[in-house]
C-alpha cells in the first residue's frame, strides 16, 4: 500500500513523544530535521517492508541503518532470539555462545586474533581508542572530518582553523581539553596525515578511520589509502583503528577490509550486522593488543550487558545465513537501484554523482565534483534537492534515510517486487528534485 500524506497517528505519536523524550526521538536523525516534516513512527517490519502507525507500508531502504542484511524478521534470526530468550534474557555471566560468536568473527576476518563483545558501536570505538592509548602511552588521536565513530567525547571534535591545529569541541558538553587530544584532518589526504605526524608523531597513539566513509554519504577511500595510512601510522609507532561498525559483514563476509585487502589494521570495531539488529558490537585485533584489556591487563573495560545472550543469538544466526548468495543479492540490488536513481535524475537534468562502496550507496546532488573525496566537497551539494526527492519517495511508499549524509541500505529480502516499487516511484521523485528550490541552510545531523 503506497503512502499518502502524513496521518493523524504519526502526528499524535510525535506530539506524545516530544512531551517525554528530548526532541521526540532517541537518536537525532529520526526527527527528520535534515529533510523537514513529521517523522514516521514504525510499528512492524518484515522482509523488505516496514509499516508505520497509520498502517502504511513502505519499501525500506534504511534497514535499521544497516543490520538487517537478511531482511526484517528473518525466520532464522527470530527463531534464534526466541529460543535464547526462553533460556533467560541476561545472566551477568559468560556463555558458550559468546565464544562461538568470537570464533565466527575470527574465521571471517583473519587479522582479528581476539574479540571483546560490547553493546554499541560507540563502546567499541571508545574501547579501541583506550586500548591504543594504553598500549602506546601516547595521548593524541587522528580522525577524519566527516567520519563518525559514535558519540564519545574524544570523537565529537571538529577541525580547527589550520592543518595541525588542535581540534574544537563538536558538541556542547565536550571540553576543549578533551577535543584538543583529537586531530581532525581532511579524508583521503595522506599529505595532511604525514604533516601532522611530522609535527606530533611522538604523541600520536592512533589513527581511527571508517573503512569506507558512510556517514557523510558514501565516500570510498582512494585506492591504496587505507594501506598507506596503516604504513604511515606504523612508521611513527602509532596504531591503525579500522571502524567497520557500519561496513563490517555488510559489504562482504569480511567487511570492507575484505574488498580492500593488502594491509593489516591493529584494531577493528564492529557493530550493527554483528548483532543482527540487537544491541551488540565488538572490538578486535591482534592478541598482543587485546590482552592488555582487563582482566588480563591494565586497560579497563566492562559492561553488564556485554555479550547479552539474546543479542549474541541474533548475531550468530545472522552471520550463519550471510553467505555468498546473500552478498551477491545485495550487490545486484544496490547496482540496480543506484543506476536507476542516477538514470531518473539524469533524465530530469539533475546534476549528481553516485557514491558506492560495495553494496552501500548514496548520491551527491548538484555539480559538486565528479566523485567527492572529502567532507568539505560533500557539504557543498544541493541538499534541498534531496529533501524534495526524499518526500516524493516517502509519499510513494519508499522509506529512504532522512538525511542526504546517510547511506542507503538494501537487504537480501529486496526481491523483484520490492525493487519494482522503488523503480516506479523514481520518475516523480526525480521531477520533484529538479523543480526544488533552495530553502533553509543545510543541516547536518548525526544519527
Swiss-Prot record:
The keyword Isomerase applies. The keyword Isomerase applies. GO terms for biological process: protoporphyrinogen IX biosynthetic process. It is found in: Cytoplasm. It comes from the Bacteria. GO terms for cellular component: cytoplasm. Pathway: Porphyrin-containing compound metabolism; protoporphyrin-IX biosynthesis; 5-aminolevulinate from L-glutamyl-tRNA(Glu): step 2/2. InterPro entries: 4pyrrol_synth_GluAld_NH2Trfase (IPR004639), Aminotrans_3 (IPR005814), Aminotrans_3_PPA_site (IPR049704), PyrdxlP-dep_Trfase (IPR015424), PyrdxlP-dep_Trfase_major (IPR015421), PyrdxlP-dep_Trfase_small (IPR015422). SUPFAM superfamilies: PLP-dependent transferases. The modification N6-(pyridoxal phosphate)lysine is found at residue 272. Homodimer. This is Glutamate-1-semialdehyde 2,1-aminomutase. It comes from Leifsonia xyli subsp. xyli (strain CTCB07). The gene is hemL.
Amino acid at each position: 500500500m503506497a503512502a499518502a500524506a502524513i496521518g493523524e497517528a504519526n502526528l499524535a505519536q510525535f506530539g506524545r513523544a516530544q512531551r517525554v523524550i528530548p526532541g521526540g526521538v532517541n537518536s537525532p536523525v529520526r526527527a527528520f530535521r535534515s529533510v523537514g516534516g513529521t517523522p514516521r513512527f514504525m510499528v512492524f517490519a518484515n522482509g523488505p517492508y516496514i509499516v508505520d502507525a497509520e498502517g502504511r507500508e513502505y519499501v525500506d531502504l534504511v534497514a535499521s541503518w544497516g543490520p538487517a542484511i537478511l531482511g526484517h524478521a528473518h525466520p532464522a534470526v527470530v527463531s534464534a532470539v526466541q529460543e535464547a530468550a526462553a533460556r533467560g534474557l541476561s545472566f551477568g555471566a559468560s556463555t558458550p555462545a559468546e565464544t562461538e560468536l568470537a570464533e565466527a568473527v575470527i574465521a571471517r576476518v583473519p587479522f582479528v586474533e581476539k574479540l571483546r563483545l560490547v553493546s554499541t558501536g560507540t563502546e567499541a570505538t571508545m574501547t579501541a581508542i583506550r586500548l591504543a592509548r594504553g598500549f602506546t602511552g601516547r595521548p593524541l588521536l587522528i580522525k577524519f572530518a566527516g567520519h563518525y565513530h559514535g558519540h564519545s567525547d574524544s570523537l565529537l571534535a571538529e577541525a580547527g582553523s589550520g592543518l595541525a591545529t588542535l581540534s574544537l569541541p563538536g558538541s556542547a558538553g565536550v571540553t576543549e581539553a578533551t577535543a584538543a587530544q583529537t586531530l581532525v584532518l581532511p579524508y583521503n589526504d595522506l599529505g595532511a596525515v604525514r604533516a601532522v605526524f611530522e609535527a606530533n608523531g611522538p604523541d600520536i597513539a592512533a589513527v581511527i578511520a571508517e573503512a569506507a566513509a558512510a556517514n557523510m554519504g558514501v565516500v570510498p577511500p582512494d585506492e591504496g589509502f587505507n594501506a598507506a595510512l596503516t604504513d604511515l601510522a606504523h612508521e611513527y609507532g602509532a596504531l591503525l583503528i579500522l571502524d567497520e561498525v557500519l561496513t563490517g559483514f555488510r559489504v562482504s563476509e569480511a567487511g570492507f577490509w575484505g574488498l580492500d585487502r593488502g594491509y593489516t589494521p591493529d584494531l577493528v570495531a564492529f557493530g550493527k550486522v554483528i548483532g543482527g539488529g540487537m544491541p551488540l558490537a565488538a572490538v578486535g585485533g591482534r592478541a598482543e593488543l587485546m590482552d592488555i584489556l582487563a582482566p588480563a591487563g591494565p586497560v579497563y573495560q566492562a559492561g553488564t550487558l556485554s555479550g547479552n545472550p539474546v543479542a549474541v543469538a541474533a548475531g550468530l544466526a545472522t552471520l550463519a545465513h550471510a553467505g555468498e548468495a546473500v552478498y551477491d543479492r545485495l550487490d545486484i540490488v544496490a547496482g540496480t537501484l543506484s543506476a536507476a536513481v542516477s538514470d531518473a535524475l539524469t533524465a530530469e537534468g539533475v546534476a549528481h554523482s553516485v557514491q558506492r562502496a560495495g553494496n552501500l550507496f548514496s548520491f551527491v546532488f548538484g555539480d559538486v565534483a565528479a566523485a567527492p573525496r572529502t567532507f568539505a566537497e560533500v557539504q557543498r551539494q544541493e541538499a534541498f534537492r534531496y529533501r524534495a526527492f526524499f518526500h516524493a519517495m516517502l509519499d510513494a511508499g519508499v522509506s529512504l534515510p532522512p538525511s542526504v549524509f546517510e547511506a542507503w541500505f538494501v537487504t537480501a529480502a529486496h526481491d523483484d517486487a520490492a525493487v519494482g516499487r522503488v523503480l516506479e516511484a523514481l520518475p516523480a521523485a526525480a521531477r520533484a528534485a529538479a523543480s526544488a528550490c533552495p530553502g533553509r541552510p543545510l543541516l547536518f545531523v548525526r544519527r
